[in-house]
């Protein structure tokens, strides 16, 4: 249902999706599919000759795909360097023009400057390099203190779709950071799915069944979330089964507002979250779409290097939803005005 919703929105307002890790047959196949289906306008960042030779050697068509070479676009790099200087001031490196020949940095600059709507990277680059490019070129949203991520977990056979956060960015979040992650994840879930988030703050304890500094950290984070978003349905600390299985919730957390029906799972650490999503993916029959990076001033998202063509396509569709929702809202308002 979620991917179908994203597909419908994409057909109404296709996004410009830039791929900096373009020398990858998975990206070429995904880009060709998005283009042929009218779901997006893919932009590949690479040397055109090198990319076409690569595509030819792998038997992948490139008909209709736009390719941009950072080395051959000095004017764009100069524009991006000027924007970088205006935003970062003295922190801008003296060799900014040269650094912008890097596909990751160039793609991040395209999104920051409005030359593309979404950047999808990470199929070849490490998460650290993707985040570094995002932070250096795009920067954080105004008021944002914590960069984080969320995976959209989609069932292949049965079960509900879920959000898993944070599985990629913050290793040992403080209570304040955990609260930031929960609030950002709730907002992302609502924007992408159109559903109200039901947030579970996970731990190895349910409602004080264990005492430990890690448990106290989750409890404190839950209170911060409640103070900052009193209308949000949130509970913690909870074990996964108490957050996900109504029958278990009735035993372990009978007073929980979630009643075992949480749809956004906030893990207490990166270690727990990363292990958890991979178990759900490899043993539980769930597809992992993402991670969607939360907190950057423009959308730049990170794939797992083990991603499939389908996962690249789905992340491109999902990542564009907030922008498409805004486009549709503006269109509706314009219609009302007219």
Swiss-Prot record:
Protein name, UniProt field: Phosphate acetyltransferase EutD
Catalysed reactions listed for this entry: acetyl-CoA + phosphate = acetyl phosphate + CoA
Pathway: Amine and polyamine degradation; ethanolamine degradation
Its biological purpose: When expressed independently of the eut operon it can restore growth to a double pta-acs deletion mutant.
NCBIfam families named among the record's database cross-references: PRK09653.1, pta
pH dependence: Optimum pH is 7.8.
UniProt-annotated location(s): Cytoplasm
Quaternary structure and interacting proteins, as annotated: Homodimer.
């Amino acid at each position: 249902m979620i991917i179908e919703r994203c597909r419908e929105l994409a057909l109404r307002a296709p996004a410009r999706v830039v791929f900096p890790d373009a020398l990858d047959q998975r990206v070429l196949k995904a880009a060709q599919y998005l283009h042929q289906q009218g779901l997006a306008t893919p932009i590949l960042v690479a040397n055109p000759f090198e990319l076409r030779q690569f595509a030819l050697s792998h038997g992948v068509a490139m008909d209709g795909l736009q390719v941009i070479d950072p080395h051959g676009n000095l004017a764009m790099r100069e524009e991006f360097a000027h924007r970088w200087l205006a935003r970062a001031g003295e922190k801008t490196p003296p060799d900014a023009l040269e650094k912008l020949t890097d596909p990751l940095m160039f793609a991040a600059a395209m999104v920051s400057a409005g030359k593309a709507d979404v950047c999808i990277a990470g199929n070849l680059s490490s998460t650290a390099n993707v985040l570094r490019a995002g932070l250096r070129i795009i920067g954080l949203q105004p008021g944002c203190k914590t960069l984080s991520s969320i995976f959209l977990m989609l069932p292949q056979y049965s079960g509900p779709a879920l959000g898993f956060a944070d599985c990629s960015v913050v290793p040992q979040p403080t209570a304040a950071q955990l609260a930031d992650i929960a609030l950002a994840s709730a907002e992302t879930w609502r924007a992408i799915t159109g559903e109200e988030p039901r947030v579970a703050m996970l731990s190895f304890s349910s409602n004080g069944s264990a005492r430990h500094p890690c448990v106290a950290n989750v409890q404190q984070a839950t209170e911060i979330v409640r103070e900052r978003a009193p209308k949000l349905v949130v509970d913690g600390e909870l074990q996964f089964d108490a957050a996900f299985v109504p029958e278990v919730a009735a035993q372990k957390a009978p007073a929980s507002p979630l009643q075992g029906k949480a749809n956004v799972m906030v893990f207490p650490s990166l270690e727990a979250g990363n292990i958890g999503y991979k178990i759900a993916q490899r043993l539980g029959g769930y597809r992992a779409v993402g991670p969607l990076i939360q907190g950057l001033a423009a959308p730049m998202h990170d794939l797992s290097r083990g991603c499939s063509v389908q996962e690249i396509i789905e992340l491109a569709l999902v990542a564009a939803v907030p922008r498409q929702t805004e486009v549709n809202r503006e269109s509706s308002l314009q219609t009302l005005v007219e």
